[in-house]
Swiss-Prot record:
Cited InterPro entries: RNA_methyltr_RlmE, RNA_MeTrfase_FtsJ_dom, rRNA-MeTfrase_E, SAM-dependent_MTases_sf
Domain of life: Bacteria
Source organism (scientific name): Rhodopseudomonas palustris (strain BisB5)
Gene: rlmE
Gene3D superfamilies: Vaccinia Virus protein VP39
Active site positions: K179 (proton acceptor)
Name by which UniProt lists this protein: Ribosomal RNA large subunit methyltransferase E
Amino acid sequence: MAKDTTGRMRVTVKSAGRMKLSSKLWLERQLNDPYVAQAKRDGYRSRAAYKLLEIDDKYHFLKSGLAVADLGAAPGGWSQIAAKRVGAPDGRGKVIAIDLLEMGEIPGVTFAQLDFLDDAAPDRLREMLGGGADVVMSDMAANTTGHRKTDQLRIVGLVESAAQFASEVLKPGGTFVAKVFQSGADATLMTQLKRDFATVKHVKPAASRKDSSERYVLAMGFRGVPIVAPETVDE
């Protein structure tokens, strides 16, 4: 155990057996991350809970009685925060969550193990919501290939799909918040969001690691712009 540049004690992991360097570095980062330790003390399932806490503490979009759709919810940190703030455990609000992975029960949260990109997922989510949503939030991240351009396209595609779903289910005045990377949401998506929402910005909460390119796009004040299908011309 040694001290880091801030004077705090730092845990180092000795390689054992066939542990890969990447696994060793990941474990060291987890052991030395103050948000990981705080999440355990506070009973949150992941450090990601503090990202949503910080964003909502500043922008106040999670309010009592609202309906929330949480895309890519597992292990459940964001759902825990949303459920508490909208009053889902006592029936004042509602949180609907989906993920490819299993997720343990959270009081007030209705969960379905679904691939959001599956054609049937949006309709299933609408059915679970039983009406419109006040907040659509996505902490989804695409599986990486190691090829930067391919990974960026996958990330953009995932965020665009989440934004499209948000535009279909959000009530007027609603909020969309989603994880993006590198330079943030691309120009096409930003144009769409600025058309459909009163306020659009990028935010990077303190709980997001400094060495990470992770950011969040926050769009508030949904205008309720209807989606118009392309016109067909009869010949």
